[in-house]
């Protein structure tokens, strides 16, 4: 009814916002970030049997600057957390994160100091996928749900507000500065401390001590070393 009846065949009416979101959701390229067992299922989903290319995801990019979606497949160690964050920061907007598997979402069975208890402590997550590991069909379903979310994302002033809120949630990682080797590179004092610890063979002890100092709920254990 209405103006649609007066248009010739093959002409569609839409808005710029919906057109942009349609183009975004129809070509979501993933970043290759497989960390553990879930990566096997992720690779299977991209194979010919499941063929994620049907939804414009036939290409996984090794360069974060050419990727739209980071699929964190597997548990994230404390040493890998700053690398993950760096790759996320190198991805251009708009960008999305899918936490694949229970280990990436909440630490899973690895409830210890070496594993980040949820990748949302490091980067903002748009979609959580449970499972240990989730099957390729489950990953495809999560991607399709993420496509629906992308289709309804606002643009213009509302989009800027959403982007600012996302940055406010994700730009301050929980991983404390100075708690792992990669953060020592830009701090001369900490780098000297780390070099000394390496010479004495106690770099792992130093890393754990610095990590515990950065965790308020672990201060009660400081007295056990004395």
UniProtKB/Swiss-Prot annotation:
It is found in: Cell membrane. It is a peripheral membrane protein. It catalyses: a quinone + NADH + 5 H(+)(in) = a quinol + NAD(+) + 4 H(+)(out). Binds 1 [4Fe-4S] cluster. Pfam families: Oxidored_q6. [4Fe-4S] cluster binds at residues 37-38, 103, 132. It comes from the Bacteria. One of its GO terms (biological process) is electron transport coupled proton transport. InterPro entries: NADH_UbQ_OxRdtase-like_20kDa (IPR006137), NADH_UQ_OxRdtase_20Kd_su (IPR006138). Gene3D superfamilies: 3.40.50.12280. It is an enzyme of class 7 (translocase). GO terms for molecular function: 4 iron, 4 sulfur cluster binding; iron ion binding; NADH dehydrogenase (ubiquinone) activity; NADH:ubiquinone reductase (non-electrogenic) activity; quinone binding. Belongs to the complex I 20 kDa subunit family. NDH-1 shuttles electrons from NADH, via FMN and iron-sulfur (Fe-S) centers, to quinones in the respiratory chain. The immediate electron acceptor for the enzyme in this species is believed to be a menaquinone. Couples the redox reaction to proton translocation (for every two electrons transferred, four hydrogen ions are translocated across the cytoplasmic membrane), and thus conserves the redox energy in a proton gradient. This is NADH-quinone oxidoreductase subunit B 2. It comes from Salinispora arenicola (strain CNS-205).
